[in-house]
Swiss-Prot record:
Species this chain originates from: Dictyostelium discoideum (Social amoeba)
Organism lineage string: Eukaryota, Amoebozoa, Evosea, Eumycetozoa, Dictyostelia
Coiled coil regions, renumbered to chain: none
Protein name according to UniProt: Penta-EF hand domain-containing protein 2
Gene that this polypeptide is encoded by: pefB
UniProt keyword annotations, A-Z: Calcium, Cytoplasm, Membrane, Metal-binding, Repeat
Quaternary state and interactors: In contrast to pefA, does not form homodimers in presence of Ca(2+). May form heterodimers with pefA.
Leader sequence segment: none
Phenotypic effect of disruption: Cells lacking pefB and mutants lacking both pefA and pefB grow normally in axenic medium or on bacterial lawns, and have no major differentiation defect, apart from the fact that mutants lacking pefB have a stalk base thicker than normal.
Binding positions (Ca(2+) 2): 89, 91, 93, 95, 100
Membrane topology: Peripheral membrane protein
Residues reported in the UniProt entry to bind Ca(2+) 1: 54, 56, 58, 60, 65
PANTHER family assigned: GH27120P, PEFLIN
UniProt subcellular location: Cytoplasm; Membrane
UniProt record, GO biological process: sorocarp development
Amino acid sequence: MYGYGYTPAVVAPTVMSFSFVPPQAFQQCWFYSLYTQIQQAQLYEMQSWFMRVDANRSGTISSGELQYLNIGGTPLGIETATKLIKVFDHNKNGQIDFYEYAALHQFINNLYRCFVANDRNFSGTIDANEIYNALITSGFQLPFPTVNYLFLKLSPSGYGLLFTQFLNLCATVALTRSLFEWNDPMRTGVVHLNLAQLYDIIALV
């Protein structure tokens, strides 16, 4: 697990009232497979972090709270946090519960492993070709021209992306996937959108 951390005001730990078995609706989401990869010991660690952040005991956290998640000593930031909230917020209430957070956390862990594996020259950055390979490893099959376009949006000069930038790119891809699935409840692989719905998707991404 990459160096995550969060240091809000200390809140006395309490036992959360839910089990680690997520609701049925959550199990229908593409990111449920991420949740199933997590060992129970890791779930307890994630639960502890979640409880510290959820200071008002609402059972959910917002992008304003998630932005302080540290990645190698660097906070996630509000832009990426907001995008990730949208990816994993399957009930679209603008916040994420513990199950959604755990899947999000595993998503970041997996992406970091892919980033390291594809940073073959140990520069701390990866280029468009390496990003293309990392996305395939992460389960996202995108044409290379699309990957290159996303890469140049974040790095117009063509310089390699840092992990936080790579995570932002992957969050965009994952959000697009979530928005597609929400409009494809029968999982046919095809969606029919009117212009207003397309505008909504563009606004969210």
